[in-house]
Amino acid sequence: MKYQVTFFDKETKYKPVACIIEAESRTEIAKGKWKDAMKKVCIKRGWKPSEMVKMGYTTWKCRRAE
């Protein structure tokens, strides 16, 4: 199943970034697949994961992608 994982700043929800990943369930994403999504976003944007965290992208949410 495909899921959209969105990362955003918890306080302001400013400029969210998202990607679509394959996973069996949301539980699988919560257990660590979100890290793969974060790497995918970083590669797409040319960031390092540590830079992404410093910019404030510390919260993520997941929803089913159609």
Where are these regions (language model features)?
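N-terminal acidic leader/helix
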Residues: 2-28, 59
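Short, mixed-charge low-complexity intrinsically disordered segments
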Residues: 35-66
